Amino acid sequence: KRMQLQPHIVYLSNTGTVKVGITRKKQLPTRWIDQGAHQAMAVLETPNRYLAGVAEVALKNYISDKTNWRTMLTNSEDNQDVEEVFKSLQTHVPEEVKDCFINELNNVPIDFPYAQKIEKVIKSHSLKKDPNVEGILIGIKGQYLIFEDGAVMNIRNHEGFRIGLNVKTLSI
């Protein structure tokens, strides 16, 4: 009940394609970073989770509410601007949340530096399947470690695991 009855944000984020989502107000910008969004914008602030959900359900009839993690990791950034996308969606916002529009929209760019880009995700490591993961780490995006060979590992899926880590510095 405490989580539901607090301010929530309805947002658009670009994680390779623009999507709609909701989060508790105090989770920004953490939520966008976790998703690997390269741009995001809060568009509605509701007093509770229910009203944010009403808006999200209405908008997901016109725009996805899912992140395609493979697209996000290959940095296949489309050139859609979240502000322009929102302008096209405003007429689809339900009447009961129209007074929740955020007056000053702020398009937030987020940068995830990589040593190099990967063209394709070739493998997703799982410590449950193989407890040994080796590779050269070239980047971190969202919840993922990205390795030179195109393999990735979702760190959030491994919460609670105890690991050992050997780090070698490569000379270039």
PLM regions: where:
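Non-catalytic accessory segments flanking enzymatic or RNA/DNA-binding domains
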Residues: 1-172
